[in-house]
Amino acid sequence: GRYLAQAGDCKACHTDIDNDGIPFAGGRALKTPFGTIYSANLTPEDETGLGRWSREDFYNALNEGIDDEGRHLYPAMPYPYFTLMTRQQTDAIFAYLQSLEPVHVEEEENDLPFPLNIRMSVSGWKLLFFEDEEFEVDPDRSEAWNRGRFLVDGPLHCGGCHTGKNILGAGKDDEYLRGGTLENWFAPNIRGGENGGIAHWSEDDIFEFLKYGRAKHTAPMQRMGEVVSISTQFLEEKDLRSVATYLKSLDDTPREPEEAPDPAQ
């Protein structure tokens, strides 16, 4: 459970890092194009945390985006990715979180305009863009490739930053891992095959970057620095190399250059 929580980078979003917050106690302001959402308290505190949640409640949150009271969760919480995890895996994460010291925190109100401040509006978003699905192994691919795809598309939720979004904030299939934006930060194309954004990286380069935060070509910056320091550096070498195997299998197509606007217009 602890390992999966590290892979999912739960601590980064659920800690008010900017104000020296207590780990996993929530309160971090997540600025989205639609307003500000404050992360939840994941400690087992009864009033403001997960103290009264059951394993079933937690599974529903990660698998269906529904909280213990049946309310829809905003997709700033990456359940569209976490849904690939099994019940056994979510139960393990829950067991780890329940072992933390309970922390009572004052909950911040989300700052969202109408009608987005009404959680029922998320149901429409889910109908359009969310699919509760299980991970399916591709029998034609290696064990490492399948493990890498599970990690990338599931716990690591790489597409949350590195996939372009539509106007409603859902990932676009044709922009899968081709680069995206988050809080005015550009997350680059991480497809590693022919014409991909990291085509010039080797699998060793990807491993070194995720494990040690170093590479011949760049260093982790902004949110990616958090990902390495809080999440990927703690993952096993076998898993990180599986991620590299999967990313290096993703070819890309050159983008058509955008036409410059006519200065006379």
Regions found by a protein language model. Name each.
Residues 19, 52-57, 67-75, 164, ...:
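Extended intrinsically disordered, low-complexity coil regions enriched in Ser, Thr, Gly, Ala
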Residues 105-122:
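Extended, well-folded interaction surfaces typified by the phenylalanyl-tRNA synthetase beta subunit core
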Residues 217, 221-264:
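A cross-kingdom marker for long, charged
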Residues 29-59, 80-89, 175-216, 228-240:
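Electron-transfer interface patches adjacent to heme c in soluble/periplasmic c-type cytochromes
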Residues 1-6, 124-153, 259-265:
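Electrostatic cytochrome c docking/interface patches
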Residues 13-19, 63-64, 98-99, 161-167, ...:
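Detector for the c-type heme attachment site
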Residues 1, 8-17, 58, 93, ...:
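The canonical Cys-X-X-Cys-His
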Residues 2-11, 145-159, 167-176, 201, ...:
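Sequence context surrounding c-type heme c attachment/ligation sites in exported
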